[in-house]
UniProtKB/Swiss-Prot annotation:
Keywords: Ribonucleoprotein, Ribosomal protein, RNA-binding, rRNA-binding. It comes from Marinobacter nauticus (strain ATCC 700491 / DSM 11845 / VT8) (Marinobacter aquaeolei). Part of the 30S ribosomal subunit. Forms a tight complex with proteins S10 and S14. InterPro entries: KH_dom, KH_dom-like_a/b, KH_dom_type_2, KH_sf_prok-type, Ribosomal_S3_C_sf, Ribosomal_uS3_bac-typ, Ribosomal_uS3_C, Ribosomal_uS3_CS. Belongs to the universal ribosomal protein uS3 family. GO terms for molecular function: mRNA binding; rRNA binding; structural constituent of ribosome. This is Small ribosomal subunit protein uS3. The keyword Transmembrane does not apply.
Length: 227
């Protein structure tokens, strides 16, 4: 059987940026990497209800900058910014350097693979039929302007004795075209029958200008957000 490469990993440096952006000496590299993983796990656990899509960690000289992309910024920030201040202190203790936390709102959660996967997994945990959950998520994404979307679920679907996987697709999802902007994510639904895995691929269009266009678009959206 053929194995598919991770759609995000194969596009790094082509049209996708890394989620950890820093340089380290050889002796510090493993320590920093482990620290990043621990911080991500801590934030994912702490902000489980905040619909967190992505966490970007940057390490400029002797401090750290963490950008949390979320569909519910209010939950992360908390009343008068209390929650985000507490979060900053805790993460700073973990990393051993001063930490600055930025919150970026995800304006279209139906077009974010991780949030779609979380949503489908949440429905499966609430015992919604898996086909209905997949179909609803696919229709919402296509309505929001996705060029194509594929959702796959695998496990003891509907409480069946034998585990299997099923998928639903609409539109185009070109995994081999490197200039294709494919957003990919996985998530787990913990049901009474066991764990059901959810995979989501969303095709948002082609990026013809490579990394230069990605950075230009990012800069433009940043200016728009600051206005």
């Amino acid at each position: 059987m053929g194995h598919k490469v991770n759609p995000t990993g194969i596009r790094l440096g082509v049209i996708k940026e890394h989620n950890s952006v820093w340089y380290a000496d050889k002796k510090d590299y493993a320590k920093n990497l482990l620290n990043d993983i621990q911080v991500r796990e801590f934030l994912d656990k702490r902000l489980v209800k905040a619909s967190v899509s992505k966490i970007v960690i940057e390490r400029p000289a002797q401090n750290a900058r963490i950008t949390i992309h979320t569909a519910r910024p209010g939950i992360v920030i908390g009343k008068k910014g209390e929650d985000v201040d507490r979060l900053r202190r805790e993460v700073s203790d973990m990393m051993g350097v001063p930490v600055h936390i930025n919150i970026e709102e995800v304006r279209k959660p139906d077009l974010d693979a991780r949030l779609v996967a979380q949503n489908v997994a949440g429905q499966l945990e609430r015992r919604v039929m898996f086909r209905r959950a997949m179909k609803r998520a696919v229709q919402n994404a296509m309505r929001q302007g996705a060029k194509g979307i594929k959702i796959q679920v695998g496990g003891r679907l509907g409480g069946a004795e034998i585990a299997r996987s099923e998928w639903y697709r609409e539109g185009r999802v070109p995994l081999h075209t490197l200039r294709a902007d494919i957003d990919y994510a996985t998530y787990e639904a913990h049901t009474t029958y066991g764990v059901i895995g959810v995979k989501v691929w969303i095709f948002k269009g082609e990026i013809l200008g490579g990394m230069e266009q990605v950075r230009a678009d990012k800069k433009a959206s940043g200016k728009k957000g600051s206005k």
